[in-house]
């Protein structure tokens, strides 16, 4: 993994964004950017299978709102909660958009066109939970592209 910036540098960048965009929703902007990149990775095909790896906190919220956009675009989107309590509003929105919750066991027997990692953000701590390690190992072995 390549370090792009530290958590403190990212917090400072976020604060700069908030200062420049008072009243705007950074999560909505981030989720839309993730959905746009996911669409580019999926190509011009509807009905692709997408797995969203969901963590607690705002990073998970970004992924859930991106999942909502992807489902609204006609993709089959599944949600795997792997760490913490998912962002409540994002979880409700994703389920209402037709996304489906799956278990780690479900995932191991499926094929996906894309996986979106929205587990850890700037609040992440050292040590990777076992379920996330197993899921990451499966993704590598399956050749599933990860955003």
Give the predicted meaning of each segment.
Residues 1-5, 43-147:
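Glycine-rich phosphate/dinucleotide-binding loop and adjoining beta-alpha-beta core of small-molecule
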Residues 1-48:
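Positively charged, low-complexity intrinsically disordered leader regions
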């Amino acid at each position: 993994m390549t370090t792009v910036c530290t958590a403190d540098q990212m917090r400072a960048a976020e604060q700069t964004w908030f200062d420049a965009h008072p009243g705007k929703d950074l999560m909505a902007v981030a989720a839309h950017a993730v959905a746009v990149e996911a669409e580019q990775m999926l190509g011009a095909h509807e009905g692709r299978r997408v797995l969203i790896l969901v963590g607690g906190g705002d990073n998970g919220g970004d992924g859930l709102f991106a999942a909502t956009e992807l489902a609204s675009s006609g993709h089959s989107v599944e949600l795997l909660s792997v760490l913490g309590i998912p962002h409540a509003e994002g979880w409700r929105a994703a389920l209402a958009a037709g996304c489906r919750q799956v278990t780690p066991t479900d995932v191991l027997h499926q094929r996906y066109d894309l996986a979106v990692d929205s587990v850890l953000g700037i609040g992440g701590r050292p040590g990777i939970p076992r379920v996330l390690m197993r899921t990451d190992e499966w993704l590598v072995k399956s050749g599933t592209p990860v955003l």
